[in-house]
Design a protein with these regions (language model features):
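Bacterial N-terminal signal peptides
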Residues: 12-21
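Bacterial N-terminal signal peptides that target proteins for export
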Residues: 2-12
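Polar/charged, Q/E/K-enriched amphipathic alpha-helical segments with strong coiled-coil propensity
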Residues: 132-159, 264, 268-276
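Extended amphipathic alpha-helical interaction segments
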Residues: 151-250
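N-terminal Sec/ER secretory leader and immediately downstream segment
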Residues: 41-148
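A cross-kingdom marker for long, charged
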Residues: 229-296
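Immediate post-signal-peptide N-terminus of mature secreted/exported proteins
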Residues: 30-85, 148-159, 163, 174, ...
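C-terminal motif of bacterial Sec signal peptides marking the signal peptidase cleavage site
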Residues: 22-26
Length: 296
């Protein structure tokens, strides 16, 4: 379950959206996170806005992919195994290509983003037309006319490009995740130094919950006792927030924690997906929260 994507915005506070790009081989996890106000680490507002372009691009892509993972996952698996399809769904490669290219045209905020970004765009240039052709092929039932001839031609090519895409995409994620984490941690420090106890606690809750889920890596045994202890610690911090403005977010947090504990007790794909969805709802609540009101 390696984190796939992080997101940083310039408003309200740092928050994340957890999504899963695939439900085929383990528990890939991605996140979309928000950071606040004036771009920590002394970055200008323009730099933050440029970074946000990438955040929105990958956030939209991941949201669609997890929403329709029930179809995307089985389709790529069947093509990988040489099975015939009668319908087809791919991630929104075309939208991602358009949005990432627009983001690149506006600027690249970190030097170490340039190479992985170019790799992703290069694969997208190849996979977008193949995915589009397959989509039309199945939508028009052309497989009935050619007895799956085009599927046999394009299916293996699509699978190969699909794997190349995620190999490149995960590299881009790692860089975005690194910078976003640094910015969020710096912002937490700012909140603490400015005496905004409730806002700092809300930010700490988000960061600790995100770090916990980051640790649920595919193929790595989870220390369930340690995870439950950390969840209790997160709840303790949440309970220290005295502002009623946090109540709705706290309810979403408690639900997410419950789903995480269910997953820890029985680590199935269904429980994992429930955990991801409840985490998304918690972050949705965080993104609607006005952090400035927490310490008034």
């Amino acid at each position: 379950m390696k984190p796939l994507v992080k997101k940083m915005l310039t408003v309200v506070l740092c928050a994340s959206t957890l999504t899963a790009p695939l439900f085929l081989t383990g528990c890939s996890v991605s996140k979309v996170a928000n950071s606040v106000q004036q771009g920590v680490q002394k970055k200008s507002q323009d730099d933050v806005k440029v970074f946000n372009n990438y955040i929105k691009a990958v956030g939209d892509f991941n949201s669609h992919t997890v929403r329709f993972g029930y179809a995307i996952g089985p389709d790529i698996q069947k093509l990988r195994e040489g099975q015939h399809l009668t319908s087809f769904m791919a991630p929104h490669f075309d939208s991602l290509q358009k949005n990432l290219q627009a983001a690149k045209d506006a600027g690249v905020p970190y030097d170490d983003m340039k190479e992985p970004l170019d790799k992703v765009l290069a694969v997208l240039k190849d996979i977008v037309p193949v995915a589009s052709e397959l989509d039309t092929y199945y939508e028009t039932n052309s497989y009935q006319a050619d007895n799956y001839a085009k599927e046999q031609q394009l299916g293996p090519k699509y699978v190969q490009l699909y794997d190349q895409f995620y190999a490149a995409y995960n590299q881009l994620d790692a860089v975005i995740h690194k910078h976003n984490t640094e910015n969020q941690q710096a912002h937490l420090k700012e909140l603490k130094e400015s005496g905004k106890k409730n806002a700092a606690a809300a930010q700490e809750v988000h960061l600790r919950l995100t770090a916990l889920l980051d640790g649920f890596e595919e193929g790595k045994q989870i220390d369930v006792n340690a995870a439950n202890q950390e969840l209790q610690g997160i709840m303790d911090v949440s309970n220290s927030i005295t502002s009623p403005e946090y109540n709705s977010t706290k309810n979403s947090l408690n639900t997410a924690i419950g789903r995480i504990r269910t997953f820890l007790g029985d680590q199935t794909n269904d429980h994992y997906n429930d955990m991801v969805e409840s985490y998304n709802r918690f972050i949705g609540s965080m993104n609607r929260l006005d952090m400035n009101k927490l310490d008034k």
